[in-house]
């Protein structure tokens, strides 16, 4: 098996003959040679993903086809090639993979061709699961965690808490799938698995950086959150600590395999006192004690603009203070009153992309009173803590109410000294709370060892190892392994576990410390608070449902797509949207801001927001909540015209919310069978304009919110009432008995502006579709025979099985029509509906929607007449269209109108 086999050459030659250079390159990259895919073939494929005329689905299909080979070498190389393209190729590639319902189905793969095949098959199964998870998380988030910006103004650091709480479990699931690869150094025995391991290693570094940013963001905002959110955040933080241990083990394997130490970050655990502080805060919230949750009366030096004593509960955080008050110390007494702005100083667990501006001012910054001491609880990984050490005497934690008794130097003081009355206390905390920092900070018992850039008087042996780690390049620099970052900025370089006493790390470079005082853009900060602070409107709902929220968050991460379903929608018009999707991207502009549904029985609907469900969760709030109907969701002209952000009245019953949120088009769902059963409630009117960019909505005037039966016929311009969905009056759920219209009703509905369709419905209603066989002069057309076979079979009782909103199964909808079921199920339709599966079929509610993804967005396929149980796949091939009569065969061509006049 050393070289290419004959079959490899034949396959490549076949594709050469057919002229498919891309498929040929895929074959060349996945030969039977036991070595990683050759760089020239990978580069060719990467270049191909950037070409506009290359068929990405065909490339992916060829890779999937190679992954069905019986040889572990070919399969493994197909996986490595796919992973390489997901990471380095154009985003169109991973976007397409995310749109597919199935990717690699290798959970049972086994190559029995030798002991090596058995061993490698195990890793193939794990690796394929990770790649599936990677595509799935892209589908849910609409971005790739490994590609997004990291650091102080990165995506995870600036994300609003509601969205953050939903994103973190998705990220945790992806990291878990990666860690399950679980390889030992002695198993990395060939070039194929080595190539896979290198890709996984690089992914893990980027994913963990994102994870770290998310945790920093959570901790910054922890003291402003409501009780339910605090519970979720604490749970996420606990999981983070356990995953850190597993990540460290993975990185040890990488080190043993010979990956450059400079590329491997050192991880240091946060002090346990941090966890205690968080738990104490949560207990205070649950105990409903107002005021200072930490029990210290002195306001934090940083929160002078709004003293802690004025705040009764974190829920009442004033929205106005976000821009003016300096970042609050995260351990401040409940002073959520001074909301933590998203300025960089407020904490860097792993400051991944440090900014180099203002370096000269940085050395003095930490000693400046409150505003300058904005590093408060500190750039948790920021190097400025070292500078702080050199300039501040170490008797700092004088008034630290939580400081333990004098302890051996190994213990760090509790970071709760936010209430310290002196600035020095604050700065000292900066040095000690380095959750993961390089800050080998001196404990209270020892003098600062050295200033930034100098050499330490005595460096213990373990520290030398850490220095070695420091001197490498920055693993998070934008380009792979680029060495542009200053050596001391390897931001994962941390305290080695062996050190008995923390010591300041001397670094070879004399670059000044990063000041970490550049504030990130104000709009982001405003958007973030808009989302957090206005959430108080639904505090009552959250209180009653926080238990449910907690269970959702604790579910397996792969399914816990949007953990806390009960966050209330922001009320500031369109403020959070630019934050979530600045470029009106077609994936998920508002998929994460859901109005609270109170006790509405839909916890699983959190599973259904998908890549394209633009506003899937902006369903109308039930009457139990205090927040108004979501008017602001229309502020952005979504690609689907905000089809699902309905402005229906608040008095709708809770089932209404269920229907509109769950049924509203998770265009890409299809993973897992755990989606909820459809309810037969009517659809809110806002869903009728599925593809109409609602201009009233865009300018802030939500269409009539008074009654949910107000329906704008102009949505179906030019189609008469033929395709108009049946709307039940005033938002009442339609009783099942009124669903199948009588033949007379269907006939009257059918008399639209389209003569052919009207006549077709008359034929169905009058039941004389068979009469033409009596006419001898029409026999040459053989019309009736065309209606009898297979997919074209048409029952005589059709009037009872299709409601007025869906054309009869024998007719072809007009080419200009919007499929009436594309956005929602037609009302209670028992038979061949588009949005709702008939009872008894295993089809999930969303199964027929994915057809819309891989095609141009404004040209949905006709799915209206789908046969019950048909599972549509997202690839836009004719085979996936619902079986119906070809346009050429007019069902009325052989009928004489005189027959039924």
From Swiss-Prot:
Every ENTH domain range: 14-145
Keyword terms of this UniProt record: Cell membrane, Coated pit, Glycoprotein, Membrane, Methylation, Phosphoprotein, Protein transport, Transport
Sites bearing Phosphothreonine, chain numbering: 317
A GO CC term attached to the entry: AP-2 adaptor complex
Record's compositionally biased regions (Pro residues): 512-522
GO function terms (MF aspect): 1-phosphatidylinositol binding; clathrin heavy chain binding; molecular adaptor activity; protein kinase binding
Record-listed Phosphoserine modification sites: 296, 300, 306, 313, 594, 600, 621, 627, 761
Asymmetric dimethylarginine PTM sites in chain numbering: 859
Post-translational modification: Thr-310 can be modified by the addition of N-acetylglucosamine which can be further phosphorylated. There is no evidence for direct Thr-310 phosphorylation.
PANTHER family xref list: CLATHRIN ASSEMBLY PROTEIN (PTHR22951), CLATHRIN COAT ASSEMBLY PROTEIN AP180 (PTHR22951:SF4)
Free-text note on domains in this protein's UniProt record: Possesses a three domain structure: the N-terminal 300 residues harbor a clathrin binding site, an acidic middle domain 450 residues, interrupted by an Ala-rich segment, and the C-terminal domain (166 residues).
Function: Adaptins are components of the adaptor complexes which link clathrin to receptors in coated vesicles. Clathrin-associated protein complexes are believed to interact with the cytoplasmic tails of membrane proteins, leading to their selection and concentration. Binding of AP180 to clathrin triskelia induces their assembly into 60-70 nm coats.
Protein name in UniProt: Clathrin coat assembly protein AP180
Annotated organism of origin: Mus musculus (Mouse)
